[in-house]
């Protein structure tokens, strides 16, 4: 995919390497053409105790994506990656853009990193989970949940590797072909 563009739609932070701050340097290092749009801005990962969250309004996010779709460069789009969303209202315009991009640029790959929470705790409002499950998951080719996020998306308890495989298989329908789950509890540790 070295000649196609990846569009990364996720968070930006002042300090740290999460969201677009993590993705873009990797793409640059790999000489992979990539562009980004930020869903939110934060001082740092919320785990650092920061509280200020500046959410890109859904209408603005939708307008930016619609304008991007009018650019000549849009025809070179090969993949879309999404991560953290600050409000459930952001998901509909992103889902619409993914659908339009898929129609205009077949084949396009959509990777959903469902940044929802970890270790049994949601980082986001539950309405984001609902919108993600309803509007983004059906468009995804690849998802990269941690164990907690896989539990939420599949709506099933995951206590071990066997449960994780079962949950992943439950989700693999329609476009979805790859579930790359992290932090799965095993008898000896985690995978």
Which role fits each region the language model picked out?
Residues 123-191:
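Conserved phosphate/ATP/ADP-binding segment of small-molecule kinases
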Residues 2-112, 116-119:
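Conserved N-terminal subdomain of the carbohydrate kinase-like
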């Amino acid at each position: 995919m070295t000649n196609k563009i990846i569009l990364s739609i996720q968070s930006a932070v002042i300090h740290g390497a999460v969201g677009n701050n993590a993705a873009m340097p990797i793409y640059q290092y790999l000489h992979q053409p990539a562009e980004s749009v930020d869903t939110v801005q934060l001082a740092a990962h919320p785990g650092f105790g920061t509280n200020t969250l500046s959410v890109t309004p859904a209408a603005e996010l939708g307008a930016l994506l619609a304008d991007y779709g009018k650019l000549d460069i849009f025809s070179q789009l090969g993949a879309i990656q999404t991560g953290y969303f600050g409000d459930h209202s952001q998901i509909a315009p992103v889902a619409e853009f993914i659908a339009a991009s898929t129609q205009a640029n077949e084949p396009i790959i959509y990777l959903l990193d469902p940044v929802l929470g970890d270790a049994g705790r949601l980082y986001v409002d539950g309405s984001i989970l609902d919108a993600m499950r309803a509007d983004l998951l059906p468009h995804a080719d690849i998802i990269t949940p941690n164990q907690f996020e896989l539990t939420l998306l599949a709506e099933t308890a995951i206590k071990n590797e066997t449960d994780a495989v079962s949950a992943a298989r439950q989700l693999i329908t329609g476009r979805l072909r790859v579930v790359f789950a992290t932090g799965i509890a095993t008898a000896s540790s985690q995978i």
